[in-house]
Amino acid sequence: MPVLSKEDWAFWQENGYVVVHDAVPQQNLDAMVDVIWDFLQIDREDREAWYKYKPYSRDDRCSPISAAGMVEIYQHQALWDNRQYPRIHQAFSEIWGDEKLWVSLDRANMKPPAREDKPEWCNEGMIHWDKDTSQQPVSFGVQGVLYLTDTSEQQGGFQ
């Protein structure tokens, strides 16, 4: 059964991205959220604890989290449960026109809200491409972002 509707496919063709609603079950999302909090050893109910670490930098890589919120966790089963979930696989298969996919891995992200008293977390980021854009023409690539919690239009990792 296709994941992308005709409207989704037309949107993908026009805009270069598509939103797949309910891509994985809620229990997968909840499990991954738990894994992130556990990995960071942070009590999610203690909002001050969200700032427990200073983000790592090129000079100091002793923190498990970057200023952009990248959490240094790559191989946990909860990540793989989402990467390989059938609905995710099907969506990518439809875009690529092939069921033989190579699953790449990235990590999780958790960035606490910016606060004036925590300037190290006020990083507004930059436009980042996971491609070498100096090579012309730029080769085709597809990447997925899975939001684990509700996110307003004013939040998130896209500019």
Residues covered by each model-derived region:
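Non-heme Fe(II)-dependent double-stranded beta-helix
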Residues: 1-14, 21-136
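A short beta-strand-loop-beta hairpin characteristic of the jelly-roll/cupin
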Residues: 153-159
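A residue-level signal for beta-strand positions that form part of recognition/binding surfaces
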Residues: 17, 100, 141, 157
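Conserved beta-strand segments that form the floor/walls of ligand-binding pockets within enzyme
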Residues: 19, 126, 143, 147, ...
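Short, conserved beta-strand element in jelly-roll/cupin
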Residues: 134-153
